[in-house]
């Protein structure tokens, strides 16, 4: 009798232990999947931001307008901050990557200090222009090396969790493609010889990367490839490489890339709805045949093909025969700054060369926009009378607390300087004043 009782107790214990062990394994596996997805996201964003950084530095070199150069430097500074943040989220603690981080800090420090000074009174010196050219060449080299690592990683399905293991084993490091690639990047930066130990490290902020407002049904891998072929205008599916984020990802994605002769492309596509979130095509530009205005019409058509309707052109620029267009969502006449997208169009043939819809899909939603409690004239009364107002719009912006507020947006000129002024449409308070050389005014002296 006691024998059968003992057997029963032991059986229950064994089963209980097995269940506990399985649950422990499942939890650890979920954690690993989540970590792998975060590493993948950070790496692909780092590669993407390095592409943009190189492009924006090239844009700055091509500019001839001091008024537009300062905001361009602010954009470059922000990109270095974002790239720096992504580096910090990769498992590179055991891999010397300090010089690359310092390189990003140097660019950020240089562009920030340049952006906040008056370039009319103190324009770029020949030495500073040469430094900017050096940054352009060097960032281009890093961009190409990261793209090569990315291509191999996607082709071979490499995992970042393996990088962590390799970094703790000197022998394994020699056989890890990702580790070797980052060591190549670090050696390249070391050869630049420009790191300045006195420069401060750029502070970074953690951002919410969840895409809460994606719509549509989930697309299969084959459907994603077909969609990518249409977007990239590629007829041979075998040219495309695709990888899928793990099940633990906050936002399941397909990462799709291709290399064709001297042309390279990369895209992040949301599994839900098949929406392209980031897209970049790099190729040699030919003779310009499309005007900047014609390019904006093509950009709007591209947005419509992706289901992004009611978008209003906010600003545009041109460099190296590429048109860069920023659009805001127009909600029944109200410009929504958080629902912004950027499109790049080749002005040689009108091809789509770049797309960023992150902000749109992170923020876009059906809003119940209240009626303004003050009139536009009352809002104008809260703007300095010496400001010559040129344009006005209703706009939704984020205030200092990160909350969306309805405002009257005024574009005006004072002392030959252009300002964008946002007045709260409920209480008439000033929410934000921007000087359009990129410097934000944080005080009320213009009121």
From Swiss-Prot:
Q: Which Pfam families match?
A: PepSY, YPEB_N, YPEB_PepSY1-2
* UniProt keyword annotation of Cell inner membrane present: no
Keyword vocabulary terms for this entry: Germination, Sporulation
- List the InterPro entries: PepSY, YpeB_N, YpeB_PepSY1-2
Give yes or no: UniProt keyword 4Fe-4S.
no
Note the NCBIfam families from the entry: spore_YpeB (TIGR02889)
Instruction: Name the protein family.
Output: Belongs to the YpeB family.
Could you tell me what this protein does? Answer: Required for spore cortex hydrolysis during germination. Appears to be required for either expression, localization, activation or function of SleB.
In Swiss-Prot or TrEMBL terms, this protein is called Sporulation protein YpeB
